[in-house]
From Swiss-Prot:
Region (Interaction with FADD): 1-227
Protein's name according to its UniProt entry: CASP8 and FADD-like apoptosis regulator
Region ranges (Not proteolytically processed and involved in apoptosis inhibition): 1-435
Annotated stretches, region: Caspase: 263-358
Organism in which the protein naturally occurs: Homo sapiens (Human)
Outcome reported for the amino acid change (mutating residue 376 to N/A): Abolishes proteolytic processing
Length: 480
């Protein structure tokens, strides 16, 4: 996306449209708060999150269909078709909030601000603020989130906007089946700490196992005070006792991409012993990683298997992997997850998709200039729409993910290039010795071990573990 196009869009939007666009993208550029639309779009462009389709989606969301036609040469119907067939840049939650804001008049917003004083405190937000400003403040106080809309629903009822209350209820029903919850901005902003592991980022697993388990299952209501790997940022409020089916032989494909070369044998032996068909690839570039992931995401063999595992070991940045390349940016981690969402990878819809990522973070001084790799999943398009038409994708597209990311300093490899990752060693040991226990429980104990390790070593030797999941059932990596 060129700077000229960004400039044209920014100039054409009015104040309200700019406010809406900034709000819609709060979950997309989570580690920065850009002051204006031009800076926001420029940041997204630099990070590879502003393809023509992405910009078309944003213009569609702010209802500037004239700009779609004049600047992007697309009509409304083409964008709607694109949104049906591709992962969305903007979450359904943000779209819902923006739509509610459009349907409220000034007196409605004033009434909502008044009602919220009981929860926010007086003077927290002025009467002149918009509904979207109010939502942002409520998010900061953890009073509103994608899976926490009861307060807003109650207040809409109190101002007699039953139509908007009903809209929220429909949204809840649409995501309830998936048991999924999204990050709100305040929770997700803690991810900035991953850019500098020494920047006040500590594992908080020194508490008792009972406390950690309560936090893991969402019993605590103050996610900002939790460690990232145990926050409610991407967790359902509870995990039902129902178990994922694990009966296929093999249980599924385990894809190992090791761009360092230290982990392959250990991981292969572990997942083979668990009943997975292991396929491994060594020393790939970031384009090679993207290509392999795209191929595996659309494999029809997934139809016959009950789960999927991907282990990725690479050098990278805080939110991307480089493979063997020397680059400033690389393949964004969120693009990897998008490749395997239910609407892009229909044969794995409703099945657990586990990702274990060891990322050795490289300082910027060691890198060459590059740009983020644009990943749009072309290899999946032909499978995707046909499968959706057959009704394979019946759960929320972001459901059933287990995403475990460990970052460590690149200097660990320089000290001992042949030494495996402590995180992956511990994970392998847990999986082999205690496979009949729930994966979440094993990961909590793994976090505790990493916390103990970090308390004894220097900053450069520490491992920082971050867990997100949207599991709807109990996950045990053993035949049921």
């Amino acid at each position: 996306m060129s700077a000229e196009v960004i400039h044209q869009v920014e100039e054409a939007l009015d104040t309200d449209e700019k406010e809406m666009l900034l709000f819609l993208c709060r979950d997309v550029a989570i580690d920065v708060v850009p002051p204006n639309v031009r800076d926001l779009l420029d940041i997204l462009r630099e990070r590879g999150k502003l393809s023509v389709g992405d910009l078309a989606e944003l213009l569609y969301r702010v209802r500037r269909f004239d700009l779609l036609k004049r600047i992007l040469k697309m009509d409304r119907k083409a964008v709607e078709t694109h949104l049906l067939r591709n992962p969305h840049l903007v979450s359904d939650y943000r779209v819902l909030m923006a739509e509610i804001g459009e349907d409220l008049d000034k007196s409605d917003v004033s009434s909502l601000i008044f009602l919220m004083k009981d929860y926010m405190g007086r003077g927290k937000i002025s009467k002149e603020k918009s509904f979207l400003d109010l939502v942002v403040e409520l998010e900061k106080l953890n009073l509103v989130a994608p899976d926490q809309l009861d307060l807003l629903e109650k207040c809409l009822k109190n101002i007699h906007r039953i139509d908007l209350k009903t809209k929220i209820q429909k949204y809840k029903q649409s995501v309830q089946g998936a048991g999924t919850s999204y990050r709100n901005v305040l929770q997700a902003a803690i991810q900035k700490s991953l850019k500098d592991p020494s920047n006040n980022f500590r594992l908080h697993n020194g508490r008792s196992k009972e406390q950690r388990l309560k936090e893991q299952l969402g019993a605590q209501q103050e996610p900002v005070k939790k460690s990232i790997q145990e926050s409610e940022a991407f967790l359902p409020q509870s995990i039902p006792e129902e178990r994922y089916k694990m009966k296929s032989k093999p249980l599924g494909i385990c894809l190992i991409i090791d761009c360092i070369g230290n982990e392959t044998e250990l991981l292969r032996d572990t997942f083979t012993s668990l009943g997975y068909e292991v396929q491994k690839f060594l020393h790939l570039s970031m384009h090679g990683i993207s290509q392999i992931l795209g191929q595996f995401a659309c494999m029809p063999e997934h139809r016959d298997y009950d789960s999927f595992v991907c282990v990725l070991v690479s050098r990278g940045g805080s939110q991307s992997v480089y493979g063997v390349d020397q680059t400033h940016s690389g393949l964004p981690l969120h693009h990897i997850r998008r490749m395997f969402m239910g609407d892009s990878c229909p044969y794995l819809a409703g099945k657990p998709k586990m990702f274990f990522i060891q990322n050795y973070v490289v300082s910027e001084g060691q890198l060459e200039d590059s740009s983020l790799l644009e990943v749009d999943g072309p290899a999946m398009k032909n499978v995707e729409f046909k499968a959706q038409k057959r009704g394979l994708c019946t759960v929320h597209r972001e459901a059933d993910f287990f995403w475990s990311l460990c970052t460590a300093d690149m200097s660990l490899l320089e000290q001992s290039h042949s030494s495996p990752s402590l995180y992956l060693q511990c994970l392998s040991q847990k999986l082999r010795q205690e496979r009949k226990r729930p994966l979440l429980d094993l990961h909590i104990e793994l976090n505790g071990y990493m916390y103990d390790w970090n308390s004894r070593v220097s900053a450069k030797e520490k491992y920082y573990v971050w867990l997100q999941h949207t599991l709807r059932k109990k996950l045990i990596l053993s035949y049921t």
